[in-house]
Amino acid sequence: MPLFAVMAAAAFSLPAQPPAATGANLTVAMDDARIVLLGQIDTTDARRPRLGYPGTGMILRLEGGALSLRLSSTTDTSALTVVIDHGAPALKMLRKGEQTLVLASGLDPGPHVAEVYKRTETWKGVVTLTSIELSAGGSLLSPVSLPARKLLFVGDSVTCGAGVDNNPKCNEEPAHPISDSYHSFGMDLGRRLDAQTHLVCYGGRGLDRDYRGLGVAEGVLNAPQLIDLSIPSDDPGSRATWDYRRWTPDAIVVSLGTNDFNLEGIRPLSEEKFVTDYAHFLKSLRAEYPGAFILTTEGAIVTDPRLRRYVQEAVAQTADARIAWVPAEHYPGNGCNAHPDAPQHLHMADDLEPVLRRVLGW
């Protein structure tokens, strides 16, 4: 398996800064070129990158017995996933405010690889990375080389991995959130296909309206607006924009419509508007990424045949041979949460893997 088949998202190497000694340990600023940042991440302040979308994070190589991460969280509901030396992913819950998170301890001299991914959605909190701390005698090694292949997944809470860790109690325990981006179908596909992976997703949002029926007119952002951001927020003062030139996907998988259809029995969608807006969104993706293959699907939750038809009509309206529709299987969660759970996310990846391999020649 390729060295970085376990990872996802994009990398941005930044100018190296000399590390500063702190007592017996070594502190390294986040703009050190040996720290590779992952995902649609906000680097407005290169020394304090911010993680909004799930799956954003960092990867680095080191020698030394211990590694810590200095960070701050806007809430006490954010969580990270930490992977050391391609081992089992570990859950790290965060508290609100500044903190030092031990990523690894008791390691042999190495070398080692450490990966950190934002586990939870943006609305659960934004995480700012401040610095890396290595134990005495430790050092960072040359930056990792990421896979050349790149995948972008655009969607809602399912794309984010909400429900992956559904538990038998049918509740979300504060110490163990049910969201897990690392085991989402998109991130899993990235590992299978040896590709960097971006997740641009937000729970409860759709193409034109969210699960409450709200859209831009009510100050609520949906996918066509979220795609432009690295920190998505309905509050204009809290947003950060994304520069499309920083990363170009080979393929884009769009899974939208579940939340648009949430109020279908009360406030039916206009088929004409939904189809036209969807086609316009697909064309806007094409304009930003001329070489990407774009796959659309209706998602794993809604079984209404109208949604499937609307998506197909939108694809046809683009008249683009490299924009296609693939049917979604229904994955109903575990009985107490409608979101697909971990085994079902694996099945979703199973469904899409042969399609992506075929259209991309991978």
Feature roles, as predicted:
Residues 150-154, 159, 197-201, 250-255, ...:
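Structural recognition of the beta-strand scaffold that forms the well-ordered cores
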Residues 253-257, 282-287, 293-296, 305:
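Conserved, well-ordered alpha-helix/loop/beta-strand core segments that scaffold catalytic motifs
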